[in-house]
Amino acid sequence: MPLEKGIAELVAGFIAAGRPSSREQNIDDRRAGYIASTSLADEKEIRVSSEDIVLEGMTFRVVSPPNASGSLPCILYYHGGCFVSGGFLTHDPQLRQLAWKSGCKVIAIQYRLAPEHTFPAAHDDAERGANIVYQYAEQLGIDRERITLAGDSAGGHLALVSALRLKSTAHWSPAKLLLIYPMLDATASFPSYASNGQDYIITRDTLLSGFEMYLQGTDLRHPEASPIWREDFAGLPPVHILTAEFDPLRDEGEALYHRLNDQGVACTCQRYLGVIHGFFQLGGVSQAVRSAMRDVAWRVVSPSTGKMT
């Protein structure tokens, strides 16, 4: 399928500009550019409420649907940004949309970023944040039995590894995982890194430079650097994966679907056509975002089917 019209225009502009390299940006410019890209998001959903809180020294953004009462299901969200950028500012529109469309509380974690903080800082923050939310569930107004871990790109990676860490401790388990074009393979072994790695704004260079700044010499096949290769998925809760047709990460996301099913995990996967990595944040220009947002919101409160669509 060809690129969606709005995304095709963005891609054409990127190519016309000479395919700017993320490696040539300093980290401040890279982060500022990500924040600037929020102008491409959907309109701000103002019918929800949002507040930032600090628990046990960690900062969270809590987005609540209108008239929230009782113990609500929770989407615990890890933002993307290749481990080096992103945060509440870049993801606020999506957090608000998810809270509105799902009727759940959406809680975002601000984890430490590279290059200031290298592996395993983000992983440790992701796990610790999940445990804090579980511990304070009553105070937060959420049902601790209905916590879904979700995230996009690097955040999808952190959601998966956090669930694996929680499984190993057997303290508690999330109800579901929602992984939006997750970064899973620091070795860049899958074909879509080549076929989609140059022209589609979030390039091979963008993704791998993020991995490099975060991993800082860690073995690229380390089970928490490249979780796609793990053999201990059995026992995870149901998982849903979103992939994008023109994404360097497309193939590894779909390979994860097969590996999870092979290891006995209930898993669904949907490839969105005509879109690129990061499309979930392009609601102002992409039609696919609307259906993806509705689908993700629905899956938080609905059973998984175990089929790939």
Predicted regions, residues:
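Short beta-strand element of the alpha/beta-hydrolase
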Residues: 71-81
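Short amphipathic alpha-helix adjacent to the substrate-entry channel of hydrolases
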Residues: 89-107
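Hydrolase active-site cap/lid region
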Residues: 164-219
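Gly/Ser-rich "nucleophile elbow"/oxyanion-hole loop immediately N-terminal to the catalytic nucleophile
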Residues: 134-149
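A glycine/proline-hinged amphipathic helix-loop "lid/cap" segment
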Residues: 1-65, 305-309
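Short beta-strand/loop motif that positions the catalytic acidic residue
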Residues: 241-243
